[in-house]
Amino acid sequence: MPNIEADRVTSIPENNDRKPKSQPLRNNLHDTVKSYSIRDAATANIGPPAERHYPWGCPVTHTKEKFYTICADYAFLNQATSLCKSSSSVCSSSSEDKSALSNTINYIDLQTSESDSACNEDASLDSLSGSLGTRPLAWEIDTSDFSTMTTRLKSRSGVNKQTPKKKTERKAKPLRDCPQHLILDDVKQRKVLDLRRWYCISRPQYKTSCGISSLVSCWNFLYSTLGAGSLPPITQEEALHILGFQPPFEEIRFGPFTGNTTLMRWFRQINDHYHVKGCSYVLYKPHGKNKTAGETAVGALSKLTQGLKEDSTAYIYHCQNHYFCPIGFEATPAKASKAYRGQLFPHEVEYWILIGEPSRKHPTIHCKKWTDIVTDLNTQNPEYFDIRHPERGLQYRKTKKVGGNLHCLLAFQRLSWQRFGPWPLQLGNLRPEPQPPIQGRRIPKSESEDNVSKKQHGRLGRSFSAGFQQELAWKRMCNIRERRGSGSPESDTDCEGND
């Protein structure tokens, strides 16, 4: 193999001797290429990479080392031919251009001034290719192995591209089951919130007046124009005046004498004052006095949700140290794919109850799980569950009493004349008589309690039950003035004592 670097180094100081050396180079060119055939290249000694000096850095792509030397030599010849061709086209340029060209390729000593030399070199290369015949040259390297590798890579990349498509198709299959059109009526049955109930919430309350504030909220929804009635709405102050209380109302401690039956009695007194009809009863109370025997949590939930869809029933929830009013609910599906489904089974949804808050120190609307409410109603002394702070879990109160629970759901219902049905009732007995002015905070008699027979009491609902009869006896024995100094038998601890 000719030493190209040696020729290049010797050619630099001897610029004047280019013409005599160019002719031997052309004569030996054909012999040099012949000497490096493929058979001889297989036995060629290839040194380490540090000892190789290839002037043109031939881009050899074949993996077999036996072609490295041949590729380097033939690449040099190929580059030399291209330089000779380019030099013949610019022979008419200025001498400065010739010097610049010679500086850029200073490691090749070729005669570029004569055009016939380039033609002779082209002819010698043509004769070289003809003499080699079918022997592969540097630019004729077999790349069949590379084509097979590229096809494999393409096939693998195609497989990789197809796999995510299959995954997306699998993920998209469940989405096809979702309904395309929203069934509005069915969704309305699962999400119920009558804004009139919220409008009627008496907020804020007086200190420890959550019981009477919740009762006023229910009454306004049932009978006032603010809700579903036709009477003007009443305020807490008007209701307290009807019940015999006098200002300042901030100084009244309602907690000791405000209980479940107390609220039911006050509801009837306000109805008698405004000459309207209604009834009240305990919807769900699993433990303690006046418990709803035989009522289950599922049945109570069904009645509660059905009543919240109507405008003839209002509710009060007695929880830990507080009263407030359920105003709506949402039945949330357990699966995201059923968010807009129509009718769902009860086991496929989870119920949340929206509760209006009369206290200004808490959010205006609570959203509590029905399961948490059931937990609260089913705990017994000394255990209790604060529904407004469910994160605290079960707690224990300091009391000697064991068993029982005052927490419950109370229902207040507006009655119409059609509710009495075809029973042979005299309208005179049902029409309230004029009431004398309230003096000395005396509780007026209710004609609905005294003039209706016991048989008719059994037909009018739960407000005329054994608990109702006990309430009558209690009303005859006590008045409001006497009860202000002593606690009610069903009174809880100070209602909203922290407000």
Swiss-Prot record:
Name of the featured protein: Basic immunoglobulin-like variable motif-containing protein
Keyword list, A-Z: Cytoplasm, Nucleus
Similarity section: Belongs to the BIVM family.
Gene Ontology cellular component list: cytoplasm; nucleus
Subcellular location: Cytoplasm; Nucleus
Chain positions covered by the region annotation Disordered: 1-29, 153-172, 428-465
Signal peptide stretch: none
